């Protein structure tokens, strides 16, 4: 399956490399060209046990690539994962990146005839996926939920054991509104 991941921080990069190592074709998007270049050269931008070797392997297998995101990005995937940061200086969640990404996804969904599932892994408060992200996508794509999929899959990764946590999770939590998204 083709998977796009928006964000190459801890959650996005670990998820992308692990999914690629499981045989999926993964493209991770970031707005920082230095991060994109580093990843495409096999140099992870975070430290995690075994991540460098796994990244090297999936790059050789051509199952992983990093690309610069822009307003014209066409994701070419049936599954798009949002893994952007939500921190603020005030200690509360800042949804500015979530909102920007939701507009980009709305444009992609609008121009795509196929079903696209959007899954949120970013740290957000309950209700954000359904109210903020869904609202932006529906308003800007002209499509309603069901014509695209929407889900939430929070990550429980611990620094230092994130690869193992992803590959052998002790729990998986999935919120979804349709069976197609759940199956992906």
Where are these regions (language model features)?
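Structural/interface elements that position substrates and couple domains in central-metabolism enzymes
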Residues: 1-184
């Amino acid at each position: 399956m083709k998977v796009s991941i928006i964000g190459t921080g801890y959650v996005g990069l670990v998820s992308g490399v692990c999914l690629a190592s499981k045989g999926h074709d993964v493209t991770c998007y970031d707005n920082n060209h230095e991060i994109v270049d580093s990843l495409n050269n096999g140099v992870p931008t975070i430290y995690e046990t075994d991540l460098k070797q796994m990244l090297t392997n999936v790059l050789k297998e051509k199952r992983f690539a990093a690309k610069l995101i822009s307003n014209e990005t066409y994701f070419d995937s049936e599954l798009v994962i949002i893994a952007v940061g939500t921190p603020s200086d005030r200690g509360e969640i800042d949804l500015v990146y979530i909102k920007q990404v939701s507009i980009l996804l709305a444009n992609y969904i609008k121009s795509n005839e196929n079903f696209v599932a959007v899954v949120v892994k970013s740290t957000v408060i309950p209700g954000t996926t359904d109210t903020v992200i869904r609202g932006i996508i529906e308003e800007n794509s002209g499509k309603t939920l069901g014509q695209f999929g929407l889900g939430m899959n929070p990550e429980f990764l611990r620094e230092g054991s994130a690869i193992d946590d992803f590959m052998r999770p002790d729990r998986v939590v999935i919120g979804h509104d349709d069976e197609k998204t759940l199956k992906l």
